[in-house]
Amino acid sequence: MTIPTSYLNHTDAEAARKARATYRDGLVAPTSGIAPGFTQANMIVLPRDWAFDFLLYAQRNPKPCPVLDVSDPGSPTTLLAPGADLRTDLPLYRIWRDGKLAEETADATSAWAERDDLVAFLIGCSFTFETPMVEAGIEIRHMTDKSNVPMYLTNRPCRPAGRLKGNMVVSMRPIPASRVADAATISGRFPAVHGAPVHVGAPEQIGISDLSKPDFGDAVRIEPGEVPVFWACGVTPQAAVMASGVPFAITHAPGHMFITDIPDTAYHA
């Protein structure tokens, strides 16, 4: 999706810039509910010789991997937040080696320096449409509980591309049964940040055996009358890294996003 020029160099992005500054200074915390009204993004950084494989993977799997921006090789910058540094301005990073998680760190500068050809992909995040849902009176449980959103690896395979393969990851939010249609309608207006849910109820149908044991993030309460609603998730690329044995990658830690200067309205369909 092309961003209108009027949204670039957005002058009212002080909340987003302040949030990034706190992460640059060392704060580690999930970003749900932070800088409301601004688009958040997942990130995966790959060597140049893997970048085309991933671009094709994202094109074939736009629901979990909606690409918002791609950096030039070797550049830690993005037009989504002029002046930001992708090596330092996320609260928590993951370093991957040969498809295995090697390290979590609040500063990816040293890992980034290992190669001069790294390409960063910023991928839409469902945190972006949480603010409109809250404004519509729909509770977001992990925001209420100040925890991370629960995420699960499903049995739904993504379309492979080149050397990349893997299953879809989903995020889950408990929604009152009477508001599921509203949640789907609101999120569906934001196709660039995962859009409408991919599954409602019956978690076992998508390979989730126990909602109290998410693969990423934190478990949340599901109250009587609520239904688990699942959205495609930008942690899906990390599942591909693991399934494909990618030799080197840097990603955001699940729930710890890059906050852009772009208002969420820029991605409202």
Curated annotation (Swiss-Prot):
Keyword Lyase among UniProt keywords: yes
Uppermost EC category: lyase
InterPro entries the record matches: D-Glu_cyclase (IPR009906), Putative_hydro-lyase (IPR038021), UPF0317 (IPR016938)
Pfam families tied to this protein: D-Glu_cyclase (PF07286)
EC numbers on record: 4.2.1.-
Keyword list, A-Z: Lyase
GO MF annotation list: lyase activity
Keyword Zinc on entry: no
NCBIfam families per record: PRK05463.1
Family: Belongs to the D-glutamate cyclase family.
Full protein name: Putative hydro-lyase Atu3911
